[in-house]
């Protein structure tokens, strides 16, 4: 996900660039919503394994209920294209339990075909999906329950229309009942189906929540001793917590925080990863939600998991920690008190670019805090690494590092800003002035303005009248770049560029081709568009 702020927040922040310090609440950047999407890759990886693997050796029996797997290939005729035959349809509607089982297994195997299971063909066969749902109620025949649940799971792994068919047949309340089945295979298949359904979109997620899944799901997670069941259950739980347009009813999902806090101590990376994903979703919101997550006691363990050896755990743990520090200063301090900064320093050197970017984003929200928090970042030796990232990393990561540095110049003390200058931060900030991303040009201009403002104060205090940072910016070719920005298509950028030159880089003889005219009617500057560098900007 992109970690940039919402347009509203950014616009407000940029409009107040002449203030001595940016509002810390505005400097904090929540995650921009990209729409509710399934973790499709995760879900498809699981289903890929299920569709391609028959019942594993040694797993062909359930507690007091042996799985029956007749040789359906010799019993049921199928055409070369796998078309459903009348014989199979007759068998599934038979009153003979053996015939029902053979036919259901046949459908399940069809639905387990890769890469394109014939889901449309199955749901287009009148009465078949309803028949599967009927079989879910057959508590006297757990094998039939299991096979029907498996078939419905694979139907629900398809498109929204496929999932909708399963919902409309009334399967969800029955699946929730089956979470309390005495047979673990049935429990596991039921929770897998519910995870597929809840993961489709917000409408499906909320329907499953409104059917009352959470108590049974929490109970399953509390008592299950089977790792695969726990994995599927926590994955389903993460799908129930997922989404922002709209988010799930927090009152319905927040009770799962207690079980999630326990799952964070699992030794299984898959369980840890999905528990962290769930917490990242729950913490992605306003401060009251963040506080509820903090109050559940998960922060210290989340910070510990930043050092996990498996990236699939580190990534969601970092996402959750990053979301928590978008809160207020007190909430941010909870994370800092868990010794997060040494962990973040480690992640800033990660070979995985997405981890590095998220770590920069997290630090940027810490440097949007108070001066003591900025000092904590300084004391952890994070800034030298950020400045190196600003020079060498991929652009999306450089953007986050720029936010971190500009936020520190906005809220920092004079001594803290001088420290940043001593690390040679001016040159890489000047280099950002020619990028195509207008928002980052504004961020860089803000950071440089904060440094220049300090220099002006120093020049008045020491009586020299010379701003020491003007020369550093000129040496970094920053003045040339700021002059070019006077022809930028973005009004806020060209006004800021003009203001900086006028205020800090006044020249004896003004060049009429550079100084903008003023449109008296519109109350804004007018610039010659042709003066912009042809390759530097979109004009």
Swiss-Prot record:
GO CC terms of this entry: cytoplasm; nucleoplasm; nucleus
Entry-linked Pfam families: Arm, Arm_3, IBB
PROSITE patterns from the UniProt entry: ARM_REPEAT, IBB
Residue span, IBB domain: 1-60
Gene3D superfamilies referenced in this protein's UniProt entry, alphabetically: Importin-alpha, importin-beta-binding domain, Leucine-rich Repeat Variant
Compartment(s): Cytoplasm
ARM repeats: 117-157, 160-199, 202-242, 245-284, 287-326, 329-368, 371-410, 414-453
Start and end residues of each stretch annotated as Disordered: 1-41
Entry similarity comment: Belongs to the importin alpha family.
Function in brief: Functions in nuclear protein import.
Descriptive protein name: Importin subunit alpha-6
């Amino acid at each position: 996900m992109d970690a940039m702020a919402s347009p509203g927040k950014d616009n407000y922040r940029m409009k107040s660039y002449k203030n001595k310090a940016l509002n810390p609440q505005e400097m904090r950047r929540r995650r921009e919503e990209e729409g509710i999407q399934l973790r499709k890759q995760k879900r498809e990886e699981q289903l890929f394994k299920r569709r391609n693997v028959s019942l594993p050796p040694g797993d062909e029996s359930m507690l007091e209920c042996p799985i029956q797997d007749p040789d359906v290939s010799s019993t049921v005729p199928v055409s070369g294209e796998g078309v459903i035959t009348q014989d199979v349809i007759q068998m599934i509607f038979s009153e003979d339990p053996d015939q029902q089982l053979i036919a259901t297994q046949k459908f399940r195997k069809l639905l387990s075909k890769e890469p394109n299971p014939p889901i449309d063909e199955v749901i287009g066969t009148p009465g078949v999906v309803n028949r599967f749902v009927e079989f879910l109620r057959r508590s006297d025949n757990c094998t039939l329950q299991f096979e029907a649940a498996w078939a419905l799971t694979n139907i629900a792994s398809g498109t929204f229309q496929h999932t909708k068919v399963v919902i409309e047949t009334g399967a969800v309340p029955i699946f929730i009942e089956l979470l309390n089945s005495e047979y673990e295979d049935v429990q596991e298949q039921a929770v897998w189906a519910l995870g597929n359904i809840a993961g489709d979109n917000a409408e499906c997620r909320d329907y499953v929540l409104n059917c009352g899944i959470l108590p049974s799901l929490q109970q399953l997670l509390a008592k299950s001793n089977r790792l695969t069941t726990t994995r599927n259950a926590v994955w389903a739980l993460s799908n129930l917590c997922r989404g922002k347009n709209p988010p799930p009813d927090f009152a319905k999902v927040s009770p799962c925080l207690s079980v999630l806090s326990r799952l964070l101590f699992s030794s299984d990376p898959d369980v840890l990863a999905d528990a962290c994903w769930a917490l990242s979703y729950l913490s992605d919101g306003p401060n009251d939600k963040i506080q509820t997550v903090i109050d559940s006691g998960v922060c210290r363990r989340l910070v510990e998991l930043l050092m996990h050896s498996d990236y699939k755990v580190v990534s969601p743990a970092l996402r959750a920690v990053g979301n928590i520090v978008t809160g207020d200063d007190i909430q941010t301090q909870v994370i800092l008190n868990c010794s997060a900064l040494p962990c973040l320093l480690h992640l800033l050197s990660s070979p995985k670019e997405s981890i590095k970017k998220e770590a920069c984003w997290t630090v940027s929200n810490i440097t949007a805090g108070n001066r003591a928090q900025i000092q904590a970042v300084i004391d952890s030796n994070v800034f030298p690494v950020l400045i190196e990232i600003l020079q060498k990393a991929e652009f999306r990561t450089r953007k986050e590092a720029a936010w971190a540095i500009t936020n520190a110049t906005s809220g920092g003390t004079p001594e803290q800003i001088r420290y940043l200058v001593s690390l040679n931060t001016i040159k890489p900030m000047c280099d950002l002035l020619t990028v195509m991303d207008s928002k980052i040009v504004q961020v860089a201009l803000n950071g440089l303005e904060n440094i220049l403002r300090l220099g002006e104060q120093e020049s008045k205090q020491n009586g020299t009248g010379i701003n020491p940072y003007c020369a550093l910016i000129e040496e970094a070719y920053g003045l040339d770049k700021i002059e070019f920005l006077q022809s930028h298509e973005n009004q806020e950028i060209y006004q800021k560029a003009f203001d900086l030159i006028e205020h800090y880089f006044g020249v004896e003889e003004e060049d009429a081709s550079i100084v903008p005219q003023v449109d008296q009617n519109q109350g804004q500057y007018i610039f010659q568009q042709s003066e912009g560098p042809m390759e530097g900007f979109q004009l």
